[in-house]
C-alpha cells in the first residue's frame, strides 16, 4: 500500500496495491506510474483501473523495483535490487521515456536508490549496500561517459538511501541506520545535517506551498525493542521547514498518451 497526505488539512488516505511498492510518480489527476515488484504499472489510483503494465526483470525471480525519480524532461528513471538484500550485484538502473521505451543504463548494483538529477545529463545515484553515492554523466543516447564516487559513507554514517536536490543543487541524503538527513554541496562537503528521532531514514523530498518543506520518511525494518525504545518515532513521516527551496519534481511525461489510448 501507499499513503497520500493533504498538508493543508492533514488528511491521510491509504491506497492498496497487490504487490510490494518501491515508488510512484504522478502523470495527471489520479493517474500514477507505480514501481512494483516485477512491474511498472500505470494506474488510476482512485478507480483502481490498471491502464498499462510493463513487466520488469521477470527472469530474475528475487529482484524487485526499488526507488525511482523523473529527470528534467519528465523521463522516468528507476532501479532494481535483490529482494533478500544479499550482497549480490543483480540490480540495474533503467530509463522509461514518454513513448514507454525501456533502456537499461547501468548494472551491477546491490541496492539502488535515487537518482537525483542535476540537469539532463548529470545525476547522483546510490548503491546503499556499498555505502556509495555515484555522480554519473550520460550522453544524449543515455550512454554513461563518466561514473565517479561522489561520497562513500562510513559505518557510523549508516547507508545512503533516497535523496533530492535543492535550488542550489545541494544534495539532501537520507541515512538508513544513521538517524539523519545530510546536505552536501557539489564538492561533497557536508554543509548541514538534520538529526531525527528515527533510526532508519529512507527518503526525503521537498513539497509544501513554497516547496521549502522537506518531507522525510523512515522505517522500522530490522529494529529490535531496544532500538525502538531509543528511536520511538521510527516509521514516522517528518516535515522540516527550510529557508531553501527544492527543485520541483517533474511529472512523468506521457504527453502522447491520449493519441495512444493510454489515458
Segments the model singles out, each with a brief description of its role:
Residues 131-132, 147, 151-189:
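Loop/turn-rich, solvent-exposed surfaces of beta-rich toroidal or solenoidal domains
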Residues 48-105:
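Hydrophobic alpha-helical segments and helix pairs
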Residues 18-32, 59-75, 105-123, 153-170, ...:
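Beta-rich, blade/repeat-based domains predominating
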Amino acid at each position: 500500500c501507499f499513503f497520500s497526505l493533504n498538508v493543508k488539512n492533514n488528511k491521510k488516505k491509504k491506497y492498496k496495491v497487490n504487490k510490494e511498492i518501491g515508488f510512484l510518480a504522478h502523470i495527471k489527476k489520479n493517474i500514477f506510474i507505480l514501481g512494483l515488484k516485477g512491474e511498472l504499472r500505470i494506474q488510476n489510483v482512485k478507480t483502481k483501473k490498471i491502464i498499462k503494465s510493463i513487466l520488469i526483470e521477470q527472469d530474475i525471480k528475487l529482484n524487485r523495483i526499488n526507488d525511482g525519480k523523473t529527470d528534467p524532461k519528465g523521463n522516468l528513471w528507476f532501479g532494481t535490487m535483490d529482494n533478500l538484500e544479499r550482497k549480490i550485484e543483480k540490480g540495474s538502473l533503467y530509463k522509461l521515456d514518454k513513448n514507454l521505451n525501456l533502456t537499461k543504463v547501468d548494472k551491477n548494483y546491490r541496492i539502488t536508490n535515487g537518482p537525483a538529477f542535476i540537469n539532463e545529463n548529470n545525476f547522483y545515484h546510490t548503491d546503499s549496500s556499498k555505502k556509495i553515492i555515484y555522480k554519473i554523466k550520460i550522453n544524449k543516447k543515455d550512454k554513461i561517459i563518466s561514473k565517479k564516487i561522489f561520497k562513500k559513507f562510513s559505518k557510523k554514517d549508516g547507508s545512503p538511501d533516497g535523496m533530492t536536490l535543492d535550488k542550489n543543487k545541494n544534495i539532501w541524503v537520507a541515512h538508513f541506520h544513521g538517524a539523519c538527513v545530510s546536505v552536501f554541496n557539489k564538492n561533497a562537503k557536508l554543509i548541514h545535517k538534520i538529526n531525527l528521532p528515527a533510526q532508519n531514514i529512507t527518503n526525503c523530498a521537498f513539497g509544501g506551498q513554497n516547496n521549502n518543506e522537506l518531507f522525510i520518511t523512515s522505517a522500522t525494518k530490522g529494529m529490535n525493542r531496544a532500538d525502538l525504545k531509543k528511536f520511538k518515532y521510527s516509521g514516522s513521516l517528518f516535515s522540516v521547514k527550510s529557508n531553501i527551496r527544492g527543485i520541483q519534481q517533474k511529472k512523468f511525461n506521457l504527453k502522447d498518451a491520449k493519441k495512444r489510448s493510454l489515458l
